[in-house]
């Protein structure tokens, strides 16, 4: 069995410049060839110069070990790149490593939904005939003409921008009465969609994801606004031509029912 050379023998054999390893039939000799002779780029001080011999017989274990050391050093030599590493190269690498898969959410527990910061504005609404909306009794809105000293009866809405179905020209909002636990909502009564004021828990409302009965799609038309029920499409917050009539949910646009409102943003 061949004896394994001692580490010190190997270090002695590779003494001097450890990168200068030459291989011939009889062992290390003077340099007769290099990578520079092969018209390769200069590798600086870390270059390894080799002399290749076609005589493969009579090689010792030391020769084999030296070749292994040389090959391992060659692996560590940086290869010049014709251009800098680009973002596209990184994307190509990621596409090989990772496989893109769609994320499908069939349903989720609303108890774990974290509401984003609510955006809301205070506003007053009048129909295009300048009737203001006032609170009559405990839970009814009426449209009346106000002037002078009674203008302070006009209701101030806190209009919150909420989550709704994706629409390009419709903005989902909820309309609550400022400083009151009342919100406009839609329900069914005697087989017909109706508008009502609903009392809510102030510790829970408003919230980003409101129940659909509270949601209205706000649309701007020629400087005015319309509010369409999200629960009952094509039904709108409406007023009547008559004075002191209740505000209701109607499905007639451009007729006797008034669906266009003037919105005034206020800080009050």
UniProtKB/Swiss-Prot annotation:
Q: Name one Pfam family in it.
A: IL1_propep
| CDD domains, per database record | beta-trefoil_IL1B (cd23296)
Localization per record = Cytoplasm, Cytosol; Secreted; Lysosome; Secreted, Extracellular exosome
Lineage, top-rank taxon, reads Eukaryota
Name by which UniProt lists this protein: Interleukin-1 beta
> Does the record bear Cytoplasm in its keywords?
yes
- Comment field (misc): IL1B production occurs in 2 steps, each being controlled by different stimuli. First, inflammatory signals, such as LPS, stimulate the synthesis and promote the accumulation of cytosolic stores of pro-IL1B (priming). Then additional signals are required for inflammasome assembly, leading to CASP1 activation, pro-IL1B processing and eventually secretion of the active cytokine. IL1B processing and secretion are temporarily associated.
